[in-house]
Amino acid sequence: MPKQNRQPTREKLLDITFDEVYIHGYTATSVDTILKTAGIPKGSMYHHFKGKKELVLAMVEERLFPKMELFFDFEPKEGKSVTDVLQGTFAAMAKNKPLITYGCPLYRLMVELSPIDVTFDKLLSTRVTKMQDNLALLLQKGIESGEFDETLNVKDFASYILESTWGVLSLSPSLSSSKHFLLHSKFILETLSNYNN
């Protein structure tokens, strides 16, 4: 029975932590703010997490990473070309208001914490590598299907897609828009079309 009571508290803490850290950053987010927003006493948090760092690490694993798979969905789709998959993912990202307004949550956290915390650096870097590898595999399928020429360096182009996308998502909210993001994605697809067979 106690386990049932703790589970909703833990889930609520993770959800609110994701929102707070995404919008305000790790440093500006206080445990007190998270607890106040959640309506949870501090003692309840310590049943689940030793402190802020452990809470945010759990949030990264259980909330941020699954969201990244949705935001950057570069999985091959039956009956669709690689270009169609990329186009569909970019279109979905352009419709995601928080992503356009606040940028990529993984990238934001990485920029803030990787230089100062080894634990976060390893965790976040591992995810970035996985994303690049998945994207490279998708591009490789494009080569194997004859969509792209073999001269396409899939690893380099996967890095280019992620890094340039993070760059455009890092603009200040006043400069960001779905239209601007779609223009950026169009440039990526035009560059990729240079390798079309």
PLM segments and residue spans:
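N-terminal intrinsically disordered/low-complexity leader segments
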Residues: M1-P8
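Short alpha-helical elements of helix-turn-helix
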Residues: E11, D15, C104-Y107
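Helix-turn-helix
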Residues: K12, I16, E20-E54, A58
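C-terminal peripheral helix-coil segments that are non-catalytic and often amphipathic
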Residues: H24, G88-N96, Q132-K141, S145, ...
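Hydrophobic alpha-helical connector segments
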Residues: A58, F72-Y102, V154-I161
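Short, basic, alpha-helical segments at the C-terminal edge of helix-turn-helix-like DNA-binding modules
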Residues: E61-M68
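Amphipathic alpha-helical packing segments from all-alpha helical-bundle domains
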Residues: D84, V118-E144, D156-S159
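Amphipathic alpha-helical segments used for helix-helix packing
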Residues: P98-T119
